[in-house]
Amino acid sequence: MSEDDPRPLHIRRQGLDPADELLAAGALTRVTIGSGADAETHWMATAHAVVRQVMGDHQQFSTRRRWDPRDEIGGKGIFRPRELVGNLMDYDPPEHTRLRRKLTPGFTLRKMQRMAPYIEQIVNDRLDEMERAGSPADLIAFVADKVPGAVLCELVGVPRDDRDMFMKLCHGHLDASLSQKRRAALGDKFSRYLLAMIARERKEPGEGMIGAVVAEYGDDATDEELRGFCVQVMLAGDDNISGMIGLGVLAMLRHPEQIDAFRGDEQSAQRAVDELIRYLTVPYSPTPRIAREDLTLAGQEIKKGDSVICSLPAANRDPALAPDVDRLDVTREPIPHVAFGHGVHHCLGAALARLELRTVFTELWRRFPALRLADPAQDTEFRLTTPAYGLTELMVAW
C-alpha cells in the first residue's frame, strides 16, 4: 500500500506485513480518520511498549465509548448502545470484572477439553469436503470460512439445524460491502435470534456457553448481557480465526522448510502457531482507549478525552522485540506479542483460538503433505472489508 491508500493508517497492510508507512509512523502519532464532517483525530500507538502501557492501564485509559446520535440505526453505525450491554470491551473495572466473571463458565479448562474432539472432527469434515472436490481447491471456501463458525456455534450452543442461517446473519451484519440499511436489518434479525435462543436456554440449559452461564448465574445474567456475550464471542472468534487460517497456510507455503513444525510434537506445533499469530496479527486494533486525565505518553502530551488507537500488527513487528522481528521463524522461542490484547481485556478465548489453529494446521499437513499453491504466480487477493485481515481465496493443490 502507499500513502495514497484511503483507508485509515492503522489498518493498512501490504501482503502479509503491516504497511511501510504504518511501521514508519513513530511510537505515537496523530492520525485523522474519515473526512469532512465525519473526520476524527486520534492518537495512534505502534511501539510495543506503548501499546502495552495503554492497553494495560485501566486507571488512566478507559474503553467506554463516546456515543453519538448518528450511531442509531439509519445513521453511520450498526450497533446501538443497548446492543453492547455485555460486550466486555465496552466496560472498565469493576463492571468489566463482574461481567467477565459471568462469562468464564463458558471458557473453563473442562469446556476446552470437551471442545477438542469436536474441533478435530469439524476440521477433518471440512478437509474431507475439500478432498472430495479435488485438486485444486479453494482452502478459504472449504476450510477457513467454515471451521471458525462451526466451532463458535458449538461453543455458544446454537442448534445444528440453525447454524448455516445463524452464520449468514453473523457475516451479513458485519459486511462493510453492504448498505448500512441492509446491515442494520441483518443485525436486528441476528439480535432477535439470539434473544429467542437465550429464552430457550433459560428453560432448559444446554452444554454451550449460554447454558453454562445460565446454569451458574440464572437471572443474575440478564438477556441483554447474554446477547452481548454472544455478539462479542462471534466478533472475536470468526473473522480473526478465518483470517489466521488462510494467511497462516499462505505464510507456511511460502516457507515450506518450516512446515515440519506441524509434523512434530504438540509443543512444536503450538510454538509455530504462536509465531504465526504474532507475525500475521490479523486484528487491526482493539477498542480505542480514552484518556481519563491529562498525561504524558511516549513524550507526547495527551489530553483528557483524547482517543488512542493501538496498532497491534505494528506493535508485534516492533524491532525492540527481536533483531529479526520481521522474519517468520516458527521454531524460535515465543516472542511476547499483543495479538490477543493485554491487561484486563486480554482475550478470554485465547486458549480456544490456539487449540483451533493448531488442530487445523496439524491435520492439514498430516492429510495433505504435498500441499502447495495451485498457481504461485497468481496474485493474492486480500480481504479489506471484514473486521480482521484475511484472504478472499487461496487455491491449493496436492
UniProtKB/Swiss-Prot annotation:
**Record carries keyword Cell inner membrane:** no
Task: Name the positions where heme binds.
Answer: C347
List, in alphabetical order, the Gene Ontology terms for molecular function in this entry: heme binding; iron ion binding; monooxygenase activity; oxidoreductase activity, acting on paired donors, with incorporation or reduction of molecular oxygen
> Keyword set for this entry?
Heme, Iron, Metal-binding, Monooxygenase, Oxidoreductase
Pfam family of the protein (one) = p450
InterPro entries from the entry? Cyt_P450 (IPR001128), Cyt_P450_B (IPR002397), Cyt_P450_CS (IPR017972), Cyt_P450_sf (IPR036396)
Its required cofactor(s), as named, are: heme
What pathway annotation does it carry?
Antibiotic biosynthesis; vancomycin biosynthesis
Which GO BP terms sit in this record? vancomycin biosynthetic process
Q: Does the keyword GTP-binding apply?
A: no
PROSITE patterns named in the record: CYTOCHROME_P450 (PS00086)
Give the EC number: 1.14.-.-
What is the role of the protein in this entry? Involved in the coupling of aromatic side chains of the heptapeptide of vancomycin.
Family designation: Belongs to the cytochrome P450 family.
Q: Any idea what this protein is called?
A: Cytochrome P450 165B3
- Name the gene: cyp165B3
